[in-house]
Regions:
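A metal-dependent hydrolase metal-coordination microenvironment
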Residues: 2-118, 124-135, 140-161, 165, ...
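C-terminal functional module detector
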Residues: 1-8, 12, 32, 169-170, ...
């Protein structure tokens, strides 16, 4: 991810990279799926029917050709599910379905396309399963269908294990939609920063990691330098900065309110100041050699600034709103 992603020029476009139609095991036709996402304000879509590329044209959405391929065996016996994006060679995909996972990844990369490992938790993928293959750009950190069906939609632990091992991969939120009607759809998406609305620009930005993922809340701004991290968001319940091992920082509204109520009794805290600015409440907290500034508005956290915090190998931001919906930045690597 570009460190200046949120301050650089460009526009944000919203899209889903995992959806199924009647051409595999979805309930809607390709045209109905396009209409569904268009009516909900999406800009682009990848239809990823199982083992095949669904070819369809539309003036409503930017369409990225793709497919979901089941291939190989993981250590626990199930297949990997690989999203191949910007691939339209059905014949070749059928061939590589019977090859190794690595052979499929290598083929897609030669086609100037990219791959994503779908729903690692749902697929029973271990850390070794993900560590021992190369060439995929990311994993589904959130899969809406796996979440609502069997409570196995989140894969943050898989992601952090890979990042800790030095494997540079992105986290993507998707739907994996089959049923629609807002049941397993419009649940996970990526917001991509582009210079213009085109398939080429969207694909290029995704490959560079110039996007963030969400199931609800908005990351309005994120910046990092050696001594300072700042994030601004829509009102949320919790803000996390995740790094290697026991490093990182987390603040929730519950923690925030307890600090306010007992600021003179919490021994690890230094100076604590609470001020008000129009509708905003601002808390300034000293914690050892570190400084924390938290701004709230209408019962939600809207910004956090950390100064003097030490991260190792990487850090990523994760926010959670009052409904439990999340958003994830891509990692900044050190």
């Amino acid at each position: 991810m570009d460190k200046n992603l949120f301050s650089s020029s460009g526009i944000w476009v919203r899209g889903n990279l995992h959806a199924h139609t009647k051409n595999s095991d979805g309930l809607l036709s390709p045209e109905e799926v396009i209409d569904y996402y268009f009516s909900r304000g999406y800009d682009f879509l990848a239809i990823t029917d199982h083992e095949k590329v669904t070819t369809v044209k539309s003036e409503k959405l930017i369409l990225l050709p793709g497919s979901e391929i089941s291939v190989g065996k993981c250590l626990l016996g199930d297949s990997y599910h690989i999203l191949a994006i910007n691939v339209d060679n059905n014949e070749a995909l059928q061939k590589y379905k019977n090859e190794s996972v690595q052979a499929l990844l290598d083929f897609v990369n030669k086609e100037k396309s990219f791959t994503i490992v779908a729903h690692p938790y749902w697929s029973k993928l271990t850390h070794s399963d993900l560590l021992n293959i190369e060439g995929y750009i990311g994993i589904e950190v959130y899969n809406g269908g796996c979440d609502i069906e069997v409570a196995k939609g989140f894969s943050m632990v898989h992601w952090d294990n890979l990042l800790t091992q030095g494997k540079s991969v992105y986290g993507l939120a998707t739907d994996d939609a089959h049923y629609y009607g807002d049941l397993d759809s419009a649940r996970g998406w990526i917001n991509v920063k582009v210079k213009e609305r085109s398939a080429e620009e969207i694909l290029s930005s995704i490959k560079k990691g110039n996007f963030y993922s969400s199931s609800g809340p908005i990351i309005e701004y994120l910046s990092y330098n050696e001594n300072k991290v700042e994030i601004r968001t829509s009102p949320v319940e919790r803000v996390d900065f995740v790094s290697e091992g026991g490093r990182g920082f987390s603040v929730s509204l519950d923690t925030y309110n307890k600090v306010k109520q007992a600021k003179d009794k919490i021994r690890i805290l230094g100076k604590v100041e609470i001020t008000h600015e129009r509708e905003n409440e601002i808390a300034y907290v000293e914690l050892g050699n570190s400084k924390i500034t938290i701004k709230t508005e209408r019962g939600g956290i809207i910004s956090v600034v950390l100064e003097g915090f030490s991260f190792k190998k990487y850090f990523r931001a994760e926010i959670t709103d009052h409904n439990g919906k999340k958003a994830w930045s891509n990692p900044i690597l050190f």
